[in-house]
């Protein structure tokens, strides 16, 4: 197994992370190296990833340090140790969420909704801060008196947010993703978790968003979840034909939130209701109410 690692300045992390997710949508390991440097790593079998000597390179205009190493034959056990169960505690009146990989034991708590996600299939297992923050906001949203209703998950990845929404009673739920692997993974995960989710392959930059036209969408107040990176969220703000009732946006570095909130506010009239931060990452809840 090959481990391809890229070290980058924290302020340039977004660009590198986006490129690595294109290379390996199955997941990216994040290692903090002090205050100013972060390392991202992806794993693949020989031939799946380039095996490179240590070098200085560039992603666009961003300087990075790249290294490629072979890791021992017990890589699968190491990979499993990297993916641990995640418990998302709820507000009052809403069940907790327990997200686990299939090799971990179920929760012994009676008050949880359990979600089983295979981290080897697509990005998004609940372990990364951006996914976790979106799950926290989704629980808050599910506790509103007039929720849940229809939900659109843009960039569904492994389907963890769409599955959580279905577990919490949102319906219908539609997941969109550009990657074939993500569409297949979400369908598989929905079956494993016993929920009904529609999944479509979709290109945000080339196709019109479904469900935002009243003639096309389901009845009820639409919730949109978009755990994307900043450039795609700005594209989403420009491309939405009308505002949803609620929007949960993740995948942001904490210093990018104001720009994204401003874009959705200026274009669609959405306003910030709540912001969550974990380390350098952030997610935000915008409302049209």
Feature names for model-found ranges:
Residues 109-119:
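A short, charged helix-loop
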Residues 1-109:
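N-terminal auxiliary segments of SAM/dcSAM-dependent transferases
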Residues 121, 125-206:
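Conserved SAM/SAH cofactor-binding pocket of Class I
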Residues 3, 98, 116-118, 153, ...:
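Conserved beta-strand segments that form the floor/walls of ligand-binding pockets within enzyme
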Residues 27, 65, 98, 172, ...:
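Conserved beta-strand segments of alpha/beta enzyme cores
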């Amino acid at each position: 197994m090959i481990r391809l690692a890229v070290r980058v300045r924290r302020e340039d992390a977004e660009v590198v992370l986006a490129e690595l997710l294109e290379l390996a949508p199955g997941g990216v390991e994040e290692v903090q190296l002090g205050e100013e440097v972060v390392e991202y790593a992806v794993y693949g079998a020989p031939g799946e990833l380039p095996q490179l000597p240590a070098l200085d390179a560039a992603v666009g205009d961003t300087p990075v340090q790249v290294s490629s190493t072979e890791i021992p034959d017990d890589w699968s056990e190491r990979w499993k140790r990297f993916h641990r169960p995640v418990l998302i505690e709820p507000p009052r009146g809403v069940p907790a969420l327990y997200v686990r990989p299939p090799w971990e034991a179920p929760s012994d708590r009676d008050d949880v909704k359990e979600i089983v996600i295979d981290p080897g299939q697509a990005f998004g297992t609940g372990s990364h801060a951006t996914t976790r923050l979106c799950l926290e906001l989704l629980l808050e949203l599910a506790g509103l008196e007039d929720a849940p209703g229809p939900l659109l998950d843009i960039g569904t990845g492994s389907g963890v947010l769409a599955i959580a929404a279905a577990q919490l009673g949102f319906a219908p739920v539609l997941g969109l993703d550009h990657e074939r692997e993500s569409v297949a993974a979400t369908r598989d995960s929905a079956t494993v978790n016993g929920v009904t989710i529609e999944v479509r392959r979709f290109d945000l930059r080339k196709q019109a968003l479904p469900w935002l036209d009243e003639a096309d969408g389901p009845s009820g107040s639409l919730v949109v979840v978009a755990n994307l990176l900043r450039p795609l969220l700005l594209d989403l703000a420009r491309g939405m034909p009308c505002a949803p009732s609620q929007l949960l946006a993740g995948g942001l570095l904490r210093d990018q939130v104001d720009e994204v909130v401003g874009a959705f506010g200026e274009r669609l009239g959405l306003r910030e209701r709540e912001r969550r931060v974990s380390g350098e990452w952030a997610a935000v809840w915008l409302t049209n109410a």
